[in-house]
Amino acid sequence: MYGIEYTTVLTFLISIILLNYILKSLTSAMDFIIYRFLLLIVIVSPFVKTQNYGINLPITGSMDTAYANSSQLDTFLTSTLCLYYPAEASTQIGDTEWKNTLSQLFLTKGWPTGSVYFKEYTDIASFSIDPQLYCDYNVVLMKYDSTLKLDMSELADLILNEWLCNPMDITLYYYQQTDEANKWIAMGQSCTIKVCPLNTQTLGIGCTTTNTATFEEVAASEKLVITDVVDGVNHKLDVTTTTCTIRNCRKLGPRENVAIIQVGGSEVLDITADPTTAPQTERMMRINWKKWWQVFYTVVDYINQIVQVMSKRSRSLNSAAFYYRV
């Protein structure tokens, strides 16, 4: 009997010793693999050029200097550029091969053929409804028109910034703006917006909630409207919903893959006076206008300087995406 017990104890001790040996061997092997892997990363990392993207996070910050990233020096090798221009440009040029000519000129600046896209829009009003900013870098040419200064500034505010938006049901609810970053943005073929501010008893202030004719009109027959009312006050709205969609939006910060070039005009449109524009800089510039060929030549000549004050983005903007998450 004692022999059996001794044998059991001996077997148990041998098992422990063997297990200990196996664990030590595995630990040594894993250490060897991990160290080799880390050494490989250290050796290879200087030769790898990558760029990190956040998960649906807004990028904010000053545009005084270019954002440094490991692929910045070779931007044109891995990026796309969209150049938006009014229809009158192609009409004035009158050359069916003008885009091919510009593509060859962009090639001299380091942008391969096929990386630059030319996007035509009819006018500022129609462009504001559906911007479609799909490229890594988007440059919008807007010819100055003194009668459209407000439309131009609203479009600039829309596409140069990121907005987080939600639907509004104006038939059931009252709405209020909480702070300066909170705006109501309407888009459509024809947007007429009227508001009626309410007191704490939900009675109209200077208006009757049951009579829209008494509401204050803040926009009439516009395609893009960014409405700002008194913060902290409930409002009842009347909107031409058959031809217009309105959303409750919050400005998150600058959209840094978009730049606007104002063509002509005595001064550059300024949107930095808005207290929600932070930092107080903008990617807007002006070039003299004589002929559209001269405009495009200037853009080609300075395209790399323009891109250096922008930041490549992985998210696009169109009218549908804008409404929910820009």
From Swiss-Prot:
Q: Where does it localize? A: Virion; Host endoplasmic reticulum lumen
A GO molecular function assigned to this protein is: metal ion binding
Keywords in alphabetical order: Calcium, Capsid protein, Disulfide bond, Glycoprotein, Host endoplasmic reticulum, Host-virus interaction, Metal-binding, Outer capsid protein, Signal, T=13 icosahedral capsid protein, Virion
The answer to whether UniProt assigns keyword Ribosomal protein to this entry is no
Quote the record's binding site residues for Ca(2+) 1: 95, 206, 214, 216
Q: Which cysteines are joined by disulfide bonds?
A: 82-135, 165-249, 191-244, 196-207
Q: How is it modified after translation?
A: N-glycosylated.
Additional comment: Some rotavirus strains are neuraminidase-sensitive and require sialic acid to attach to the cell surface. Some rotavirus strains are integrin-dependent. Some rotavirus strains depend on ganglioside for their entry into the host cell. Hsp70 also seems to be involved in the entry of some strains.
Protein name as catalogued:
Outer capsid glycoprotein VP7
